C-alpha cells in the first residue's frame, strides 16, 4: 500500500505545482517532508498505522492557504474587471459627449465661415445711393426714437402735475363741503327758531348766513352737487314766512 501511496503523492505534487506557481515554496517543502517521512516509515516498517493521518494532512494541504489565496486572487481579479468595465462605460459616455460638442462647434464654425462670405458677396452690390438711403433710414429711426422719448418724459411730467392738481382740488372740495355743511346747519337752526318769541336779531343773522352761502365758490358752481343743495336751501329760506315782530 505504501508503494501505491508514493506514486499518488508524486502525482498530486506535480498537479499542485502546475496549479499554483506563485509563492508555493512553503507548501512544496511540506510535501517533500511528507515524502521523506513516508520513505522513512517504509524502511522502519511502521507505515500502516499512519496512512490515515497522512491522507488527512494531504487533504488539509489541498484545502489550505493555496486554495484560499487562489480564491482571494480570483475575487480581486473579478473586482478589477468590474471596475475596468465601469471605467470603460464612463469613457464611452465621455466620448459620445465630446463628439456631440465637436459636432456643434463644427456647425458653428461652418455658419461663421458662411456668413462673412455672404456679406462679402453682398457688399459689391451696394452703391452710394443705397448707402445714403440706409443712412437716411437710420436717421429717421433715431429721430423718431428721440421724439418718442421726449414725448414720454413730457407726458410723465404732465401726469404728475395733473395728479398734484387733482389732490389740491380734492382738498378744496373737502374744505368747501365742510363750510357748506356748517352754513346749512346754521340755516336749519334759524328756520327752526324763526317763529320762536324773544329772538330779536334772528332776521339779521339769517340774512348774513344767506350772504355767506351766496359768496362761497361752491354756491357759484351750478354743476356741483353741493352748490345745487345750497341753492335749494337758500330758495327754501327765502320762501319762509316773514311774519312776526323782529327787533
Swiss-Prot record:
Pfam families: SYCE1 (PF15233)
Coiled coil regions, renumbered to chain: 71-196
Ranges where the record places region Disordered: 189-247
GO terms classed as biological process: synaptonemal complex assembly
Tissue expr: Isoform 1 is abundantly expressed in testis and weakly in ovary, it is not found in other tissues. Isoform 2 is expressed in testis and poorly in brain, heart, lung and other examined tissues.
Transmembrane segments: none
InterPro entries: SYCE1 (IPR026676)
GO cellular component: synaptonemal complex
Ranges of compositional bias, category Basic and acidic residues: 220-241
Signal sequence residues: none
Keyword line: Coiled coil, Meiosis
Family: Belongs to the SYCE family.
Annotated PANTHER family: SYNAPTONEMAL COMPLEX CENTRAL ELEMENT PROTEIN 1-LIKE (PTHR21731:SF1)
Function: May be involved in meiosis. Isoform 1 may be involved in meiosis during spermatogenesis while isoform 2 is probably related to a later stage of meiosis, in the development stage of secondary spermatocytes and spermatids.
Protein name from the UniProt record: Synaptonemal complex central element protein 1-like
Gene this protein is translated from: Syce1l
Amino acid at each position: 500500500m505504501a508503494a501505491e501511496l508514493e506514486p499518488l503523492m508524486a502525482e498530486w505534487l506535480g498537479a499542485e505545482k502546475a496549479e499554483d506557481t506563485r509563492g508555493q515554496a512553503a507548501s512544496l517543502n511540506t510535501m517533500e517532508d511528507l515524502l521523506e517521512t513516508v520513505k522513512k516509515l517504509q524502511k522502519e516498517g511502521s507505515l500502516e498505522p499512519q496512512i490515515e493521518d497522512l491522507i488527512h494532512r494531504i487533504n488539509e494541504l489541498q484545502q489550505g492557504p493555496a486554495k484560499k489565496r487562489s480564491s482571494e486572487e480570483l475575487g480581486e481579479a473579478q473586482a478589477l474587471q468590474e471596475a475596468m468595465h465601469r471605467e470603460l462605460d464612463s469613457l464611452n459616455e465621455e466620448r459620445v459627449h465630446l463628439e456631440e460638442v465637436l459636432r456643434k462647434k463644427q456647425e458653428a464654425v461652418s455658419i461663421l465661415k458662411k456668413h462673412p462670405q455672404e456679406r462679402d458677396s453682398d457688399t459689391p452690390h451696394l452703391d452710394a445711393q443705397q448707402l445714403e438711403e440706409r443712412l437716411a433710414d437710420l436717421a429717421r429711426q433715431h429721430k423718431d426714437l428721440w421724439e418718442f422719448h421726449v414725448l414720454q418724459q413730457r407726458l410723465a411730467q404732465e401726469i404728475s402735475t395733473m395728479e398734484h392738481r387733482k389732490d389740491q382740488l380734492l382738498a378744496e372740495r373737502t374744505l368747501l363741503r365742510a363750510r357748506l355743511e356748517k352754513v346749512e346747519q346754521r340755516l336749519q337752526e334759524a328756520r327752526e327758531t324763526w317763529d320762536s318769541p324773544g329772538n330779536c336779531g334772528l332776521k339779521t343773522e339769517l340774512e348774513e348766513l344767506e350772504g355767506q352761502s351766496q359768496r362761497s365758490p361752491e354756491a357759484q358752481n351750478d354743476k356741483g352737487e353741493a352748490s345745487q343743495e345750497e341753492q335749494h336751501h337758500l330758495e327754501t329760506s327765502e320762501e319762509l314766512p316773514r311774519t312776526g315782530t323782529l327787533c
